[in-house]
UniProtKB/Swiss-Prot annotation:
Protein name (Swiss-Prot/TrEMBL): Peptide chain release factor 2
HAMAP family: Rel_fac_2
Function: Peptide chain release factor 2 directs the termination of translation in response to the peptide chain termination codons UGA and UAA.
Keyword tags: Cytoplasm, Methylation, Protein biosynthesis
The family this protein is said to belong to: Belongs to the prokaryotic/mitochondrial release factor family.
Gene name linked to the record: prfB
Positions bearing N5-methylglutamine: Q251
SUPFAM superfamilies to which the protein is assigned, alphabetical: Release factor
Gene3D superfamilies linked: 3.30.160.20, 3.30.70.1660, Release factor (1.20.58.410)
Cell compartment(s), UniProt: Cytoplasm
Gene Ontology molecular function terms on file: translation release factor activity, codon specific
Pfam family, any one: PCRF
UniProt PTM: Methylated by PrmC. Methylation increases the termination efficiency of RF2.
InterPro entries cross-referenced by the UniProt entry: PCRF, Pep_chain_release_fac_I, Pep_chain_release_fac_I_sf, PrfB
Species of the source: Listeria innocua serovar 6a (strain ATCC BAA-680 / CLIP 11262)
Length: 366
């Protein structure tokens, strides 16, 4: 990279920093951080643990953005100083180091830009992710377990905590359905990119003839909603069943009927939860999931009405095939919404989803 190219790159990044500063109200952010820290110093702060955690999460979100922006500014200034030194006197080692720093810096700016994109009302929330294999028995159920592992690996890489709210094992292998609660800042903002049907093409390990099979799993993603969301659920509209919780492999993991299946009769929505040993706690979690699904249904109906008014033929909800994972006759993962693809299918199955997620988020604001 010549000095002129380095200068051009730094001029581009300087403009991006200027744009970030223009879109971020840093003064208001400082004031809000101070207000939240004052709340945390209150002796009664932990009396309501749920409210306390909400304050902490909001504070952490602002601090992360504020500190990350200032770190970018400092790095920009440092690299501009290095460029001035190189203009005065050639230094191969310094130039090589600066080229390396610029590449890393561009990637960091890109990541920061993505975080700013996550500005929808519930992007910052935890995510509830459900996997539902399609028709095809063992083959599609095994594909479900492969996706389960993929999302667990991705969550680990992000530093997110994963709780398994419900697990229904497949008859021979894999899963019939799984519900995960993925906890972390912006978990829903990232994972909403995964909502839709995921298609697998491979030589089936369950087919003695070695034929190629196509399997489908539907992935549904919802934000975990706070209690202040007003959704009325009448007791007479509910059918509640209890049963023994089961783990992977189908074994009973509790001797009491602690697992809960809750059916909302008017909508037909069914939720299940078996993550807690207490039936009461499972009921509470199931009710939270039900309210989330009812809220999501309400929002999707509003979107559908708006789309009809605008004359848009937009499919809302799940049912659209969003991504293909091809193991045979070649290796490729392709997102059909953004056309982003990679041949490194194993890395994707090991949780390297960020490039797909980032491409989707950029496409929504592009």
């Amino acid at each position: 990279m010549e000095l002129a190219e380095i200068r051009n790159e730094l001029e581009k990044t300087a403009q991006q920093i200027k744009d970030f500063r223009g879109s971020l109200d840093l003064d208001s952010m400082e004031v809000r951080i101070a207000e939240l820290e004052d709340q945390m110093l209150d002796p009664n702060f932990w009396n309501d643990q749920q409210a306390a955690q909400k304050v902490i999460n909001e504070s952490n979100g602002y601090k992360e953005t504020y500190q990350a922006f200032h770190a970018l500014e400092e790095e920009q200034e440092s690299m501009e100083i290095s460029l001035e030194l190189l203009k005065e006197e050639a230094d191969e080692d310094l130039q090589a180091e600066l080229e390396k720093d610029i590449k890393a810096y561009v990637a960091t700016i890109s990541e920061f830009e993505l975080k700013l994109m996550l500005s929808d009302p519930y992007d910052k929330n935890n995510a509830i992710l459900e996997l539902h294999p399609g028709a095809g028995g063992t083959e599609s159920q095994d594909w479900g377990s492969m996706l389960l592992r993929m999302y667990q690996r991705w969550s680990e890489k992000k530093g997110f905590k994963v709780e398994m709210l419900d697990y229904q094992a497949g008859d021979e292998a894999g899963i019939k359905s799984v519900t995960l609660l993925i906890k972390g800042h912006n978990a829903y903002g990232y994972l909403k990119a995964e909502k839709g049907v995921h298609r697998l093409v491979r030589i089936s390990p369950f087919d003695s003839s070695g034929r190629r099979h196509t399997s489908f799993v539907s992935v549904d993603v919802m934000p975990e909603l706070d209690d202040e969301i007003e959704i009325e659920v009448r007791t007479e509209d509910l059918k509640i069943d209890t049963y023994r919780a089961t783990g992977a492999g189908g074994q009973h993991i509790n001797t009491t009927d602690s697992a809960v299946r809750m059916t909302h009769i008017p909508s037909g929505i069914v939720v299940t939860c078996q993550s807690e040993r207490s039936q009461l706690k499972n009921r509470e979690q199931a009710m939270k999931m039900l309210k989330t699904k009812l809220y999501q249904k309400e929002q999707e109906e509003k979107e559908r009405e708006l789309a009809e008014i605008r004359g848009e033929q937009k499919e809302i909800g799940w049912g659209s095939q969003i991504r293909s994972y091809v193991f045979h006759p070649y290796s490729m993962v392709k997102d059909h919404r953004t056309n982003y693809e990679t041949g490194n299918i194993q890395a994707v199955m090991d949780g390297d989803l960020d490039d797909f997620i980032n491409a989707y988020l950029r496409s929504r604001i592009g």
